Regions:
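Acidic/His-enriched low-complexity segments
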Residues: 1-245, 360, 366, 375-381, ...
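Short, well-ordered loop/turn elements at secondary-structure boundaries
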Residues: 82, 139-140, 151, 170, ...
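Short alpha-helical hairpin
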Residues: 112, 200-204, 266-267, 354-361, ...
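Short glycine/serine/proline-enriched coil/turn segments at secondary-structure junctions
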Residues: 26-28, 136, 257-259, 704-705
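Hydrophobic alpha-helical and helix-loop surface patches within well-folded domains
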Residues: 176, 209-470, 592, 599-621, ...
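Short helix/loop capping segments that flank catalytic or ligand/cofactor-binding pockets
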Residues: 99, 155-157, 184-186, 276, ...
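Non-catalytic accessory/interaction domains
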Residues: 147, 211, 296, 363-367, ...
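Small/polar loops that bind or transfer phosphate-bearing groups
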Residues: 49, 291, 716
């Protein structure tokens, strides 16, 4: 673990930054000055800076001595006095393409390459733009002004509204209102040839969505509508008004993360903000969720901020939960919680079952560790699920009441996790800390075994693992959330015995179910008659319960607690189901079964027959083309079904896709987005030519539609000729073709295809130093460790993975993922070796 970093706020407490930046876009340089008013507690203080040149430090117009400390991203100042004072600092720096600090985004408009300038200061990159106490606890107000080499039509945006626009016309300086007290990582700005639209919330907050001029004017409309309605919802739910005058949202062509919650100027990847009339239902829902997530942060993270990065998980877990709560409230017909059940839940359960996984709450000694510890499956998905679990345990009324008290007490200040637990405890009368500690401080989750022995119902808990592990006897405070009366509310000990099972049966209706609604973070292993009764009633269960059974039995099969072959009986039960939830659950089981299958074998023929049988009913019901007035759910079921049917060479789907391609071959971007990716994949599978590869790559370069680019990436990966692979490899290092932020998508798609796997695995190893240099500061860098761990399934690949990555475990940013990757592949290899023959035999007889 990295040594603890010094906290500069302990010697200097800033209150206000009066910051001016003069940016030379063409030269990629900037100069600036900042007057920092604050209280010095010592004669020797330190400020953060990274890659800045500090020209002077003045106090009352007198120069002060200072010492640069680049190794610690700091400089140290000698003061003649302590107390409240104002330091005036002159500095300069360079703009780089690292997507941190101040950086450019590149795009093409009318054939001309253009750029906009924007910022990314979370977690500790404000120091790349100006001297500061760059720590979340060091909240201050900001008076920000900006000058740049403007071109006609350029506009600038920041956290607050512009003031003195008449002076800008004379001086070229953009000046913005004073911000509220906030952390340095939330300051933001962007400028260039931008366009946008605005609207007002019920309480008068101005909401705006902006993008480059290369985007369609109406591409901002959907997000604007969502943002307005979500702010209205949050103000009502939290009973705390949105705290600042504006809420702007800016889509950036180059962006390391998915989005960033800068107060008043949220920044996004284009794919997570922009929607047009051809966008799919899934894309629209994803945009709505991301916008709602970032807006939740305006209260939880911005208005009230964690004291140190240890509690950053709470910001993200809370926002991840609230995105679903808010979107469900404004668009109930979407049934958006189903999206979480099919994405976040299985992601968390799979990752959290590997020995060595982190706990949700982790000590952070240095900001450099944040990306190391920021496992999205744990911090976002598991953390969100724990917040859903807590909300259900408390009840929504007490939960909302506690949040209101929390915001009112701590607004514009910093907190630790206990402060939220105290507010929720006061509102509910329950001991929240005691309930949550076992879930937050321990890695993993339990499996609850349920069985009947001699008229006694036995419930026991044990940590659930997939693969090699060390059992440390961990126990959890498990909310049973059962559909039966007469059972305890929680299971906190290792085992409980509940007598008179037959009497319980007589007093209750239906088979016993635990964790109803699937909100708590555990799975259940029903045994014997309990499983038999559950499966007998399967057809009458609600859709979430059906999904839950499929997910849990699949995980039990992954762990070896039950056979993979036993899952075929479950597929029989859901063959005719029509919901998106079940389509996704089926697809997860089918994806698991596919790992047992080698290409061009008899087993593959039988596997494809199984796939066709599972999804043929959906195709016959829905067809290939969208119907007027059909539901979003039907559209998404069609997408899932077609994706499997085309892989399984189902001829009606293959021929329909080919027909659509021919009708749009002069402009493939015009193919309806909901089936466009599948049409492109089908054409590559059928044609498999270098010419088509080149056409797809050319379309990738020229389009401004991020969703279309992702579809093209996936489609190109289905090529099966070495000439085409060599052509693609030649494009990967050209940032004008493949943006560094998207490189992992190309790698993932090609590595998952057997024909391309060897070529791309060797490419990654041979070019590792370049990948690290290009992406070392990017949040997608560890994907290059995790992606092969999620794909490889042979002993040969495991040996290669170990040989390449094990020597790199000295890199703390990679160590945990490497060690977990080894265990993940080893578990898969072991499972396939043990059950391959049984699965192939079952496929043959199916």
């Amino acid at each position: 673990m990295t040594a603890s970093v010094a906290r500069f706020i302990e010697s200097f407490i800033p209150e206000n930054y009066n910051l001016f930046l003069d940016i030379n876009r063409s030269e990629k340089t900037f100069t600036g000055n900042v007057a920092i008013t604050g209280e010095a507690l010592d004669n020797h203080i330190s400020l953060h800076q990274k890659d800045l040149t500090i020209s002077s430090v003045l106090l009352d117009n007198e120069s002060l001595n200072f010492q640069m400390d680049d190794a610690n991203e700091a400089f140290h100042i000698e003061l003649p006095e302590t107390g409240v004072l104002t330091l005036v600092i002159e500095f300069s720096g360079r703009i780089t393409d690292n997507m941190t600090g101040i950086y450019p985004s590149y795009y093409t408009h009318n054939g001309e390459k253009k750029e906009i300038i924007s910022t990314q200061f979370e977690s500790h990159f404000a120091r790349e733009a100006f001297p500061s106490v760059d720590e979340p606890e060091a909240k201050a107000t900001f008076d920000f002004s900006l000058k740049f080499d403007a071109e006609e039509g350029d506009i600038a945006l920041s956290n607050m509204p512009e003031i003195n626009s008449h002076l800008r016309e004379e001086t070229g300086v953009w000046t913005f209102e004073t911000t509220p007290r906030m952390s340095t990582y939330l300051l933001a700005f962007g400028f260039g040839a931008l366009q946008g639209k605005t609207a007002k919330t019920q309480n008068g907050t101005e909401v705006g969505v902006f993008a480059t001029v290369a985007q369609a004017e109406n591409s901002v409309d959907f997000a604007l509508d969502i943002a307005v309605r979500v702010i209205d919802f949050y103000e009502d739910y939290f009973q705390v008004k949105y705290p600042i005058p504006l809420s702007y949202h800016l889509a950036l062509p180059d962006f390391s993360a998915g989005a960033m919650e800068n107060w008043g100027l949220v920044t996004y990847r284009e794919v997570y903000l922009l929607v047009d009339e051809n966008s799919s239902a899934a894309s629209r829902q994803q945009v709505a969720l991301v916008v709602a997530h970032e807006l939740a942060h305006q209260w939880f993270g911005n208005l009230v901020t964690m004291k140190w990065w240890d509690d950053l998980w709470l910001n993200e877990s809370f926002a991840n939960m609230m995105e679903y709560v808010s979107v469900d409230a404004i668009e109930p017909s979407w049934n958006i919680f189903e999206d979480f059940q099919t994405t976040g839940v299985p992601h968390a359960l799979q990752r959290d079952a590997t020995d060595g996984v982190q706990s949700v709450h982790m000590e952070v000694n240095h900001p450099d560790e944040i990306n190391t510890l920021f496992d999205s499956a744990i911090v976002y998905a598991k953390g969100s699920r724990l917040m859903h679990m807590l909300r259900r345990w408390l009840g929504d009324e007490a939960f909302a009441k506690g949040l209101k008290a929390y915001f009112e007490k701590h607004q514009y200040n910093n907190t630790i996790g206990r402060d939220l637990w105290n507010a929720l405890s006061d509102a509910s009368g329950k001991d929240v800390s005691s309930f949550m500690d076992t879930w937050l401080e321990q890695p993993g989750y339990p499996v609850v075994s349920a069985e009947v022995v001699d008229d006694t119902l036995i419930l026991s808990q044990k940590q659930f693992f997939i693969g090699e592990h060390e059992d440390k006897g961990r126990l959890w405070e498990i909310p049973l959330n059962t559909n039966w009366k007469g059972l305890p509310d929680t299971l906190s000990e290792e085992r409980i015995e509940i007598p008179n099972y037959n009497q319980l049966v007589a007093e209750n209706n239906g088979a016993l179910r635990l964790n109803t609604a699937n909100t708590a973070h555990y799975i259940t292993d029903y045994q014997g008659q309990l499983l038999d009764q559950l499966l007998e009633e399967f057809a009458n269960l609600d859709t979430v319960s059906k999904l839950q059974i499929l997910q849990e039995r699949r995980l039990l099969a992954e762990s070896g607690r039950i056979s993979y072959e036993s899952l075929f009986a479950l597929l029989d039960l859901v063959e005719k189901e029509e919901s998106f939830l079940i389509a996704q659950a089926k697809s997860q089981i089918l994806a698991g079964l596919k790992r047992f299958i080698d290409e061009d074998t008899e087993a593959e023929v039988h596997y494809k027959a199984l796939v066709r049988r599972q999804f043929q009913n959906d195709f016959e019901r829905l067809g290939f083309d969208a119907k007027d007035g059909e539901s979003d759910e039907d559209e998404m079921v069609r997408q899932t079904a077609l994706s499997y049917l085309i892989q399984a060479d189902y001829q009606p789907a293959v021929l329909a896709a080919a027909s659509v391609f021919q009708a749009h071959k002069e402009n493939i971007e015009s193919i309806p987005a909901s089936v466009r990716g599948l049409v492109l994949i089908n054409q590559m599978k059928q044609e498999n030519s270098l010419t088509l590869v080149e056409d797809y790559v050319n379309a990738y370069v020229t389009t401004n539609d991020s969703n279309f680019r992702r579809q093209l990436t996936q489609a190109v990966s289905y090529l099966k000729n070495q000439e085409g692979l060599d052509y693609v490899l030649g494009q990967l290092k050209d940032k004008h073709v493949v943006k560094p932020q998207d490189l992992y998508l190309w790698y993932m798609n090609f590595l998952s295809k057997s024909f391309a796997q060897e070529t791309f695995w060797n490419w990654a190893k041979d070019n590792w130093d370049w990948i690290k240099a290009a992406l070392g500061g990017d949040m997608s860098f560890d994907s290059f460790v995790n992606i092969p761990a999620g794909i490889f399934k042979t002993q040969e690949r495991l040996d290669q993975y170990i040989a390449f990555f094990e020597p790199q475990t000295s890199d703390k940013a990679l160590e945990r993922n490497i060690l977990m990757g080894i265990k993940t592949i080893a578990a898969r290899v072991d499972l396939i070796e043990k059950e391959k023959a049984e699965v192939e035999s079952a496929l043959k007889d199916y």
